[in-house]
């Protein structure tokens, strides 16, 4: 065989090997195109999917900034310096359906809901291989139901009218009971139907948490106390006052926490990343997070929002909340931690809210119990303001 023929044979063989290898490479399934039924197979798959849900939930486009800011920006406690345009339209009640913050909340709320729906659907058919695997997946399902209810509640209240006899038949949001295929036609349902699904998801979250072997989770996750806290908030909005009182008490008991009563403890809730005795569920941040303009902390003060001086003047001189609200700092609680002023853990449910829910519910129920309402109010107010004279608080409709 001549040298030319030898080289030709070698080249042909090399090309055949190369094409085969290339063909194998090109037929790899992209990681972003794995079908859901193949993506959620092992317990680790479900944990990974749930981590993705929490990432979406804590994004600055949802509970990491927008949802929390949109409730405070247009209120009487807030001023805007126009240092930037951030939330300025919302501050002035010039809210269009093209507002970027509104669009972000809608998109990220539904992305979180969709991911929860996928965990729930695939988890229902999970087959246990190793003992304990099923309980781990059922724990993921419990959290998925709880987060789905939480997101649906926020979206319903932002894109629907407040729950009432007059409003409950008006359009709310799109109910999601299972993953929605791409390009499907969907429709909004009534506010009443939204609330019905929210309560159903809360019930299912409790049922899954009650299953054998399912463990509770920490306060940076939707734990059992957080599920009860959500139920209390939802039922208060629905004017189901007895249900709100019961659910709030369940959250108080399950949390095992206490309301802080010193300036140092109050300040530490917002200037450190330590878990507080008041926390029920919070969006956890890391010390090295770099959020810059997207931080809720940056929005308050540097990017325009501040607590107005008239609000601060309402506090008693010894009120422990002045540890954060007093002085030259005008950004309220959101001053950040000592080593990174862009971050703070962001509370979603806290113990004081549960006592205040009970106070409002006792005062507004069909047969008001103003004595109980005052008692629950003082669980928070007396600890915040050591100078408070509880004898000055009347046991009548003015208690709230």
Residue ranges and their predicted role:
Residues 22-70, 248, 374-378, 388-391:
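Membrane-proximal, proline-rich intrinsically disordered regions
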Residues 48, 78, 221, 239, ...:
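Hydrophobic-face positions in mid-chain alpha helices that act as interaction patches
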């Amino acid at each position: 065989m001549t040298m030319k023929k030898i080289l030709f044979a070698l080249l042909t063989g090399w090309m055949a090997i190369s094409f085969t290898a290339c063909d194998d490479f090109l037929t790899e399934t992209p990681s972003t195109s794995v079908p859901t039924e193949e993506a959620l197979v092992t317990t680790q798959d479900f944990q990974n999917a749930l981590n993705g849900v929490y990432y979406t939930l804590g994004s600055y486009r949802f509970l990491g900034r927008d949802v929390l800011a949109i409730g405070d920006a247009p209120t009487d406690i807030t001023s805007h310096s126009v240092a930037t345009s951030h939330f300025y339209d919302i501050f002035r009640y010039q809210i269009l359906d093209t507002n970027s913050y509104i669009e972000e909340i809608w998109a990220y709320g539904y992305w979180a809901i969709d991911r929860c729906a996928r965990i729930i659907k695939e988890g229902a058919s999970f087959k246990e291989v190793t003992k304990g695997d099923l309980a781990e997946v059922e724990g993921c399902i419990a959290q998925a139901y709880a987060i789905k209810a939480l997101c649906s509640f926020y979206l319903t209240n932002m894109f629907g009218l407040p729950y009432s006899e007059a409003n409950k038949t008006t359009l709310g949001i799109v109910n999601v009971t299972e993953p929605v295929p791409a390009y499907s036609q969907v429709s909004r349902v009534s506010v009443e139907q939204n609330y019905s699904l929210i309560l159903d998801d809360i019930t299912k979250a409790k049922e899954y948490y009650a299953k054998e072997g399912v463990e509770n989770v920490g306060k940076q996750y939707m734990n059992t106390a957080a599920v009860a806290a959500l139920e209390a908030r939802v039922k208060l909005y629905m004017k189901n006052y007895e249900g709100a009182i019961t659910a709030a008490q369940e959250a108080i008991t399950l949390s095992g926490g206490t309301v802080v009563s010193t300036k140092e403890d109050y300040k530490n809730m917002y200037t450190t990343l330590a878990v507080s005795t008041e926390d029920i569920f919070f969006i956890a941040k890391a010390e090295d997070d770099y959020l810059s303009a997207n931080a809720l902390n940056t929005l308050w003060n540097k990017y325009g929002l501040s607590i107005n001086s008239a609000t601060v003047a309402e506090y008693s001189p010894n009120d422990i909340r002045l540890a954060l609200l007093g002085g030259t700092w005008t950004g309220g609680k959101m001053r950040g931690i000592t080593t990174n002023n862009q971050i703070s853990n962001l509370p979603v449910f806290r113990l004081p809210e549960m006592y205040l829910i009970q106070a409002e519910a006792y005062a507004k129920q069909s047969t008001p119990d103003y004595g109980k309402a005052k008692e629950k109010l003082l669980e928070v107010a007396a600890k915040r303001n050591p100078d408070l004279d509880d004898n000055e608080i009347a046991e009548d409709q003015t208690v709230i």
